[in-house]
């Protein structure tokens, strides 16, 4: 499954002597916060954060990554959030890829904290920021505080076991900050009770994030974006569950807007988050259907491959890499597909992938010389 969409980038300052690492992450608020957390706490590495829509493959994202000629790509999030097509694209070009993830955003959070601490030798304080994993406003404030205090961010929900998390992260009893909004009161109350029950020495601070019109509107806009993507993908699926879930999500979003217009910002915020969650379910279900459909149709699969490789060819061509042979192979593949000669097209596609790898590795120095360079220090989120 893929759409052609714009790339959002977050840049850190760079020095000529450092390596460049791209962090590829979905626009899921939890995973995205982790990417920005790493980008702000690392020192001698140039970190480029590239965002893709949750659950959607976009060949232009691969092209954007190529334009940085990275030494390594780290993916935050599982293959549902950041599709495996990205891994295939990058590894085919000889780019090292590592995925940090878990079965859900809570497991991904723990995996990222552990891996980043080792990989970048992060010097973190004995302080933990606890925030609900679906709380947009809470996560935003938690990120700001975690960066400022060099604290760990731990995402929680109703089933979180704080004791087990501390064991996994090898945390000593220390300073805990519970970050909450009215939307997450019950979850954070349960977390607070766990801390008081299981930790005899616990310095616990609570921060309540007020629900403002601005925060409610931001949640509505995020939900609208997720729903738009879900609708586009749903047009290509016959899964009966998709339509029902979409209907519920649309109703929740409309109710969120009504609540917002009535000044009920907490209610609007909660409904918007619920609508976004359902939109992501639709994106996942539709994506699964579309992938199955493509795998069963040789022509469709080849055309999809062409879109992927053409984006890579064009960005290398723009950056001054010699892609003459690759362009010739691409035109031969198009002709073979038009003639219905799919066997020949598949054979040529293998050659084209090999040629692209050769082009990238040979032209990497050229690309690196023209790589995007940030012009100022990125502001704290």
Which residues fall in each region the model found?
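Regular secondary-structure segments
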Residues: 246, 250-261, 327-338, 346
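Amphipathic alpha-helix face/heptad-repeat signature
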Residues: 219, 245, 271, 298, ...
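Intrinsically disordered, low-complexity segments enriched in Gly and acidic/Ser/Thr residues
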Residues: 292-331, 335
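Extracellular glycan-binding segments that recognize GlcNAc-based cell-wall polysaccharides
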Residues: 14-236, 240-255, 259-292, 296
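Charged, low-complexity interaction regions
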Residues: 234-242, 260-268, 315-324, 338-346
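C-terminal amphipathic alpha-helix
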Residues: 265-298, 329-381
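Sec-dependent N-terminal signal peptides of Gram-positive bacterial secreted proteins and lipoproteins
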Residues: 1-13
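Membrane-interacting alpha-helical segments
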Residues: 223-238, 299-316, 370
């Amino acid at each position: 499954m893929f759409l052609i969409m714009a790339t959002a980038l977050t840049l850190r300052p760079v020095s000529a002597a450092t390596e460049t690492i791209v962090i590829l992450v979905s626009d899921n608020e939890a995973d995205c916060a982790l990417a920005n957390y790493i980008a702000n706490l690392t020192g001698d590495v140039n970190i480029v954060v590239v965002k893709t829509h949750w659950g959607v493959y976009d060949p232009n994202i691969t092209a954007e990554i190529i334009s940085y000629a990275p030494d390594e790509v780290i993916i935050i999030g599982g293959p549902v959030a950041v599709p495996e097509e990205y891994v295939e694209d990058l590894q085919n070009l000889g780019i090292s890829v590592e995925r940090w993830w878990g079965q859900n955003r809570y497991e991904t959070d723990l995996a990222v904290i552990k891996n980043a601490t080792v990989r970048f030798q992060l010097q973190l304080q004995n302080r933990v920021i606890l925030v609900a994993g679906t709380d947009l406003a809470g996560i935003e404030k938690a990120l700001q505080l975690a960066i400022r205090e060099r604290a760990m961010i731990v995402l929680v929900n109703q089933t979180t076991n704080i004791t087990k998390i501390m064991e996994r992260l090898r945390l000593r009893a220390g300073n805990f900050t519970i970050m909450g909004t009215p939307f997450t009161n019950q979850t954070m109350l349960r977390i607070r009770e766990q801390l008081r029950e299981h930790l005899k020495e616990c310095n616990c601070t609570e921060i309540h994030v007020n629900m403002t019109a601005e925060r409610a509107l931001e949640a509505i806009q995020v939900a609208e974006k997720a729903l738009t993507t879900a609708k586009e993908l749903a047009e290509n699926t016959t899964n009966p569950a998709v339509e029902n879930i979409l209907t519920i999500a649309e109703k929740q979003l409309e109710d969120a807007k009504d609540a917002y217009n009535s000044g009920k910002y907490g209610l609007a915020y909660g409904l918007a988050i619920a609508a976004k969650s359902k939109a992501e379910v639709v994106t996942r279900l539709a994506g699964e259907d579309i992938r199955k459909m493509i795998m069963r149709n040789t022509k469709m699969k080849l055309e999809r491959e062409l879109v992927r490789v053409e984006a890579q060819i064009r960005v290398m061509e723009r950056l001054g890499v010699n892609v003459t042979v690759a362009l010739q192979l691409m035109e031969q593949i198009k002709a073979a597909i038009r003639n219905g000669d799919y066997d020949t097209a598949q054979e040529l596609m293998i050659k084209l992938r090999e040629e692209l790898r050769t082009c990238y590795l040979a032209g990497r120095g050229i690309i690196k010389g023209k790589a995007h360079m940030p012009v100022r220090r990125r502001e704290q989120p």
